[in-house]
Amino acid sequence: MQQLTIAIDAMGGDFGPQVTVPAAVQALSQFPELKITVIGDRDAISTQLTHLNYIPNSRFSIVHSESVIGNNTQPSKALRHSRGSSMRMAIDMVANKEADACISAGNTGALMGLSRFTLKLLPGVERPALISPLPTKNNQRTWMLDLGANVSCDAETLFQFAVMGSELAEQTLKRKAKVALLNIGEEEIKGNDQIKRCAEMLNQCQDIEFIGYIEGDKLYQGIADVVVCDGFVGNVCLKTSEGVAHLFLDQLKSHLITSKFKQFIAKWLFGDVISCLKGLNPDQYNGASLIGLRGIVVKSHGSADVSAFNNAIKEAVHEVKRQIPNRISDRLEAVLLERHY
């Protein structure tokens, strides 16, 4: 059984150790091969362990950090003053081969900047990207990138995102991934110059199964396995989708589950429907990967609860086992060779 170690920024996110520590303990029971190092305020972490009646052992270790990078800290400032912070120390563990992956629910811009500075980019990669799965019909999923790491992207960067996203998705799908560019229409004449140029590049690439443009209303139809866009569009799209999903689920709860009797009736009459709707809960897909780096970094939502943060840990374990950075590097090299010849 492959042993693996994950470093967790225990102080990141809205709830810090109240979420990260229970999620880490839960993950240890799910993965016997897993070791976890939580980094943060030792007293705050120990308090949560006491609440859980959990005694640290050889699979759970604590590393004390002196500071936390705030949610409003500018990436440039985070780079200058990050030493001793829980986020920087978690990334450093990956860089120093002391951990196979790291997870943080902290400041996204700081995480991207520190990861890029510390871990460096894979050969040939211009920019890293945030990628995460979205639910689609028939209980399938579509991977979308970029989700906010890069506000604007040129055609070459979008092309690289398509290659990297394909490789990540195919490690789960076990087949060729269908790739689409998010656009304001499906016709070839639609879109800005970057999107049009990227479409030309993808059409010429035999290694990628490019199916053309896709509009926002088709994202959840399962038409494409990978959807590519710049980080501004991707982040707005993701946050809007999550907001609608939460609104729908909250409305469902308020109308159907106001008493034990109504809960019973709802479960009896609409059990399958309710189970299906729970699949829309964004918490199930928490854990966006920062791909294109020489190491594995997973970004959790800042508002994640224990279950959601646990899903981010699962994503990190998945990527370690499949050696995602190495596979992406090999795929990019193969595509570059194809384009050269």
Swiss-Prot record:
It comes from the Bacteria. Its main location: cytoplasm. It catalyses: a fatty acyl-[ACP] + phosphate = an acyl phosphate + holo-[ACP]. It is an enzyme of class 2 (transferase). One of its GO terms (molecular function) is phosphate:acyl-[acyl carrier protein] acyltransferase activity. Keywords: Cytoplasm, Lipid biosynthesis, Lipid metabolism, Phospholipid biosynthesis, Phospholipid metabolism, Transferase. The keyword Cytoplasm applies. GO terms for biological process: fatty acid biosynthetic process; phospholipid biosynthetic process. One of its GO terms (cellular component) is cytoplasm. Its EC number is 2.3.1.274. Pathway: Lipid metabolism; phospholipid metabolism. Belongs to the PlsX family. Homodimer. Probably interacts with PlsY. Catalyzes the reversible formation of acyl-phosphate (acyl-PO(4)) from acyl-[acyl-carrier-protein] (acyl-ACP). This enzyme utilizes acyl-ACP as fatty acyl donor, but not acyl-CoA. NCBIfam families: plsX. This is Phosphate acyltransferase. It comes from Aliivibrio fischeri (strain ATCC 700601 / ES114).
